[in-house]
Design a protein with these regions (language model features):
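Class I S-adenosyl-L-methionine-dependent methyltransferase catalytic core
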Residues: 2-231
């Protein structure tokens, strides 16, 4: 089993609601990156795979919780999105502060998950981390659609960024771009993508950022409450 780098937070699980301060007068959403994620490992990687917890801003609505009395009598509104109820989201300006460059080898590939609305932000983030955008590496057809402002949405994307030269040697050259897998739980990505990357770079040092699973041959940088058993 590879190394897992986790945020301890005094052995308490972190939920979306733990990131809200009940005493905060303005009741605005806070995303203290340094509080919810650990420091990056002191190691260099040739392959980095990231699924950033994008902040979509959400819409104005009342703060609600499964704990009935937590916000009893609270009438102010705050910004929430559906993702907020599943995991801590982080704003772009805070994601850009993450020193991914410090763990990237001179020759490194970054694979980053994104959605249509976050495409421009993803390229900006990759550049802030010290990479150059190259192409769309994977397209995930979720086989079901969500409502969209322009067309019904049913795809997500993995963008490929490069730093330096293409890591050598590489493995498989026949990994397909299109991944057609029915959508599962919220934000859980198909294993076929990381399996494909592993086939492409079987011998390279690899790390998954904002990880949800523990994959053989990969280091993981992850919140404690997102850790699941090795598949």
């Amino acid at each position: 089993m590879e190394k897992i780098f986790i945020a301890d937070k005094q052995d308490k699980d972190i939920t979306a609601y733990s990131l809200y301060s009940v005493q905060q007068k303005e009741r605005t959403k806070i995303n203290p990156l340094e509080d919810i994620y650990p420091v990056l490992p002191d190691k260099k990687y040739q392959v980095i795979y990231a699924d950033p917890p994008w902040d979509y801003g959400g819409k104005m609505q009342y703060d609600k919780t499964v704990i009935k009395d937590e916000n009893e009598g609270f009438k102010k509104k705050i910004f929430l999105s559906s993702a907020t109820f599943k995991y801590p989201t982080v704003k772009l300006k805070d994601l850009k502060k993450l020193d991914v460059k410090s763990i990237a080898d001179d020759d490194c590939i970054l694979f980053m998950w994104t959605t249509g609305p976050q495409m421009a932000n993803s390229i900006e983030l990759g550049e802030a981390w010290g990479f150059e955008y190259k192409t769309v590496a994977f397209v995930w057809d979720k086989m079901v659609h969500n409502s969209g402002r322009y067309t019904l949405s049913q795809t997500e994307f993995v963008l490929a960024f490069k730093r330096g030269k293409f890591p050598q040697p590489r493995g498989a050259r026949n990994v397909k771009q299109m991944v057609t897998v029915h959508r599962g739980e919220h934000s859980v990505k198909p294993a076929e993508v990381i399996d494909g990357i592993t086939k492409m770079f079987p011998e390279k040092a690899k790390i998954e950022l904002f990880a949800r699973n523990n994959y053989v041959g990969w280091d993981n940088w992850v919140l404690r409450y997102l850790i699941v058993k090795l598949r």
